[in-house]
Amino acid sequence: MWRLYNVYEKIINMKSILLLVCGVFVLNFAPMSRLMAIQPEVMADSVKTVKLTGKVVDVETGEAIPLSTILVKELGWGSVCDTEGKFKIDVPVNRKATLTVRSVGYETREVDVAPGTISGLVVKLKKSLLNLDEVVITGTRTEKGISEAPVMTRVVSAEELQRNDYESMMDVLEYNIPGLRFNVDPRGNNIQIQGLENSYILILVDGERLSQTPGGPIDFERLSTSNIKRIEILKGAASALYGSSAMGMVVNIITDSPKRSLEGWAKVRYSKFNDLQLDAGIGLAHKGFFSQTLFRRNSTDGYDLTPETPQSYTMNPSHDMNIEEKVGWNNERTKVMASASFYWNEIKNPPKGESPTHYRSLNKTFRASLEHAFGEENKLYAVYYGDFYTRTTVYDLIDLADSTNATSHEQTVRLTDIYSPLKNVEIVGGVEWNWTRNYNKMQYGKEQTVRKVNDANVFVQVDWQILPELDLVGGFRYTHHSVFGDAYTPKVNLMYAPGSFKFRAGYSRGFKAPGLTELYSDFNMGSVSHNIGNPDLKPEYSNYVSVSAEYTYNGRLNASVEGYQNTIKDKINSFIIDVEDPAPGQLGAEMHYANVEIHVLTLFAPHIPLPLFP
């Protein structure tokens, strides 16, 4: 039998040949006009607009920069340049307008447009090898340039993903996060990094957490790599902003929305063992409205590295499919977005398999969000997010109907307000409610098969630019959990940026609430094991301290060194205890859960050698 406990530790840190003939291809549907403008409709009684035309060029060569993005800062919407770098966009009449111009490999630039200007605008961009103007959001829940963020953030751009053409999201993460690896076991793909497993690494999609399967790991096959805008990676504890489980690392996968009137792609990949991957999407954007439809399907016949045992494969045959729809609308002050995704997965037994059953699962995800600006100083965000998982037992050797053996329902409602009372002060505050309801036919015993937990949260963060070179960020979250009670998680980050140097230091506290399995497990597998939960478990806490130094020279060299320590207290772990008089056919031991301790110290020194001179 098994049981959980908390430990204290410092961690040093797819079979169609026709499809094969198609090969791998990408379709880019051209827009109805060459200008590919995205111009939301602004009400006449709100802001009168006029067409502004211009061109984006390289400051050194004068050559056009195609597909640059143009944003009208005052209106909150924009356009995309055509293949000759030309653009057409609505700007306010008789009012000053500020354009934010971005392009891959160039420094972001803000351009002031004088009232009455309607044509002939030329925007010159300077090349940047380091992409130091990349905008990040995960570390503070507000948009900041990566070089201005007081919390060190690693960014994997869409261009990098397209250049490497990764097969799956697991490949993306494993190749871009040092020390991260996946261990495949019967439960799924388990992440490990610096000694910490799945439950200590928070995976977000557009800021919302992905739910885990009943076995523990996240099914990354749900995620397409084709519509990713960027991936932001934040080391250490971030519970002040994101709550439970943000103890070892936060990975925020930020998806893209359509920018052209019509765009799309289709990709096919085929390999040995009838491994087939299909990935396609189509997007529309017109006068502030956008729609995006994604389709992804994977299938394989599996493979066996032990032919002497044909009844069991190294990897079983499987197939999965994901369909996602996202729609939205925005105008000068308001943005509305809704999305839904449906993911089916089935892992079958080998042709000569002896197991009487296999599993089929369905994951349904729904999201709705509203953003409204009450002026330049105040923005309000409201989000609902629901993730609903169902696992079904399919009988292969017995004539029985399929039966649901497990469900997991996770829902979140959050209200966030961003307020700037002064030009150098920004306050983020909000409230959040989370509900979890799990049903499991076997995990919680025979008498009670449904378990629930919920929590209510209040959080606040203040970002104070004390001096042009000095930025201080402090935050705090209070959580009330239905089982263990209260949790308090503060954070503070400081960045000093004299000249070409940047020095960062920070402290943050993380926490992880005990899971339903750890609390209420009563899973008796006879002579295999008996897992027993512990309803008296305390939450796990971590204290994360980091310091870093960064140097940038002439936009062509960037070097940094970072050291951090993550101390975890009351870590939940399992241990075996002996049973004096086991029942017939059962083991003489049980696995229980309790709290323990761990420590980690890591020094990380990435260096990016680039040409120092043009």
Question: Language-model features: where?
Answer:
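Short, acidic, small-residue-rich periplasmic hinge/interaction motif at the N-terminus
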Residues: 38-47, 55-61, 68-73, 102-107, ...
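Short, acidic Ser/Thr/Gly-rich low-complexity loop/linker segments typical of extracellular
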Residues: 75-86
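Short acidic/polar hinge/loop motifs at secondary-structure boundaries
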Residues: 88, 208-235
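Extracytoplasmic beta-strand/coil segments of soluble accessory domains associated
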Residues: 88-90, 170-208, 229
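N-terminal periplasmic accessory domains that precede
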Residues: 119-124, 169-173, 189-192, 204, ...
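Periplasmic-side early beta-strands and strand-to-turn transitions of outer-membrane beta-barrels
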Residues: 240, 260-261, 269, 281-361
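Face-selective signature of the C-terminal outer-membrane beta-barrel domain
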Residues: 328-345, 360-484, 490-499, 503, ...
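Outer-membrane beta-barrel signature, preferentially recognizing the C-terminal barrel domain
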Residues: 354-373, 406, 502, 509-569, ...
